[in-house]
From Swiss-Prot:
UniProt record similarity statement: Belongs to the UPF0339 family. Duplicated subfamily.
Keywords: Repeat
Protein name: UPF0339 protein YegP
Alphabetical list of PANTHER family matching this protein: PTHR40606, UPF0339 PROTEIN YEGP
Keyword Endoplasmic reticulum among record annotations: no
Sequence repeats (start-end): 11-59, 62-110
Pfam annotation, one family: DUF1508
Taxonomic placement: Bacteria, Pseudomonadati, Pseudomonadota, Gammaproteobacteria, Enterobacterales
């Protein structure tokens, strides 16, 4: 089965961020903003390293009590955030998708 890919983008404010997309094109993880493209690339490397490890995920609820999850690096810093899901089961399926697709080495640079 095909893995997803990462997309690096430049925001209007000049900062960089990335999304991890599943093979169906759906965004399954989004990063914070980074001051440089190199920092965003380091963030991708951290997702690639940490995404296979279930212990690096934390299931949370937003203000509407909708479940979502964060992926944390070994230093406990958040390196990616999911969308909101309809149920904890759906969020856990999202974690499983990031665990699989996070290993992708395909990075599409949309800043060029």
């Amino acid at each position: 089965m095909a893995l997803g890919h990462y997309e690096i983008k430049k925001a209007k404010n000049g900062q960089y961020h990335f999304n991890l997309k599943a093979s169906n094109g759906e965004i399954i993880l989004s990063s914070e903003m980074y001051a440089s493209k190199a920092s965003a690339e380091n963030g991708i490397a951290s997702v690639q390293s940490n995404s296979p490890q279930e212990s690096q995920y934390e299931l949370k609820h937003n203000t509407k009590n909708e479940p979502y999850f964060v992926l944390k690096a070994k230093n406990h810093q958040v390196i990616g955030v999911s969308e909101s899901y309809s149920s904890p089961t759906a969020a856990k399926n999202g974690i499983a998708s990031v665990m699989k697709n996070g290993l992708s080495t395909v990075i599409k640079d949309l800043t060029l």
